[in-house]
């Protein structure tokens, strides 16, 4: 899982690629709208909505915005129809890239994503081309400054986590998708501050890249995540930490 871990850590270190607060809230709102439309407006009976609301709260989205998004999803308020779009492609070096989007206009989203792939020397692929490389997991992020990481790792496994990854002052805890909420709640009950908790697509295997290709892929992932209609981006690239630092220094 190291390839995903390093990319997730990159996002943590530089802030989200969509650091513009307004754009971030738009993305969070779309996830809430879609979840409420699919499973109903009650968080108690809608796991996806619970996760979307929690993510919004983690990012300090005002409660009024959250409530308004729920009402749009349930039909209580008028709003554009939001659909989920999964796009697959190949980046520089043949890296597999999976793009999850929420949009009110599929044609616009596909066009924007295709343009970013083309600019990077990559290409969009047919459905199923790379999705088999990934599996859905819960990923919980914890800042580990002042914590005993060995002890925390053992606790997380005892709580039901499948794996952990530690890089510098950050730990990622991987769970089966249905177990993420439970593990998060147990961590917080023991005084652990959870930095993030998301459902992500994790590569089963990763590919090592040379420096030039790594920099190209990192730029592509950033540019994709900056698109208004894109929620998350996953790849099977394994980045060298020194190359990541170089990328940040050039950004």
From Swiss-Prot:
It is found in: Cytoplasm. Pfam families: TACO1_YebC_N, Transcrip_reg. Keywords: Cytoplasm, DNA-binding, Transcription, Transcription regulation. Its main location: cytoplasm. It comes from Dehalococcoides mccartyi (strain ATCC BAA-2266 / KCTC 15142 / 195) (Dehalococcoides ethenogenes (strain 195)). This is Probable transcriptional regulatory protein DET0444. GO terms for cellular component: cytosol. It comes from the Bacteria. GO terms for molecular function: DNA binding. GO terms for biological process: regulation of DNA-templated transcription. InterPro entries: Integrase-like_N (IPR017856), TACO1_YebC-like_2nd/3rd_dom (IPR048300), TACO1_YebC_N (IPR049083), Transcrip_reg_TACO1-like (IPR002876), Transcrip_reg_TACO1-like_dom3 (IPR026564), YebC-like (IPR029072). Belongs to the TACO1 family.
């Amino acid at each position: 899982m190291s390839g995903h871990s390093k990319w997730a850590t990159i996002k943590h270190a530089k802030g989200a690629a969509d650091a513009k607060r307004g754009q971030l809230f738009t993305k969070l709102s779309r996830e809430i709208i879609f979840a409420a439309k699919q499973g109903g407006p009650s968080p108690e009976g809608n796991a996806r909505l619970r996760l979307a609301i929690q993510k919004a709260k983690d990012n300090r989205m005002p409660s009024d915005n959250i409530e308004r998004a729920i009402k749009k999803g349930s039909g209580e308020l008028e709003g554009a129809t939001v659909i989920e779009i999964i796009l697959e492609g190949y980046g520089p070096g043949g890296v597999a890239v999976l793009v999850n989007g929420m949009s009110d206009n599929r044609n616009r989203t596909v066009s924007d994503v295709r343009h970013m792939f083309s600019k990077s020397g990559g290409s969009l692929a047919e459905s199923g081309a790379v999705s088999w490389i990934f599996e859905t997991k819960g990923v919980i992020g914890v800042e580990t400054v002042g914590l005993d990481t060995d002890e925390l790792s053992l606790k997380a496994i005892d709580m039901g986590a499948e794996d952990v990854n530690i890089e510098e002052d950050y730990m990622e805890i991987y769970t089966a998708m249905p177990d993420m909420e439970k593990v998060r709640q147990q961590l917080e009950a023991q005084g652990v501050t959870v930095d993030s908790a998301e459902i992500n697509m994790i590569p089963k295997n990763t590919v090592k890249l040379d420096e030039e290709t790594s920099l190209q892929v990192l730029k592509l992932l950033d540019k994709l995540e900056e698109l208004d209609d894109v929620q998350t981006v996953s790849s099977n690239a394994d980045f060298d930490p020194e190359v990541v630092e170089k990328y940040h220094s050039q950004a």
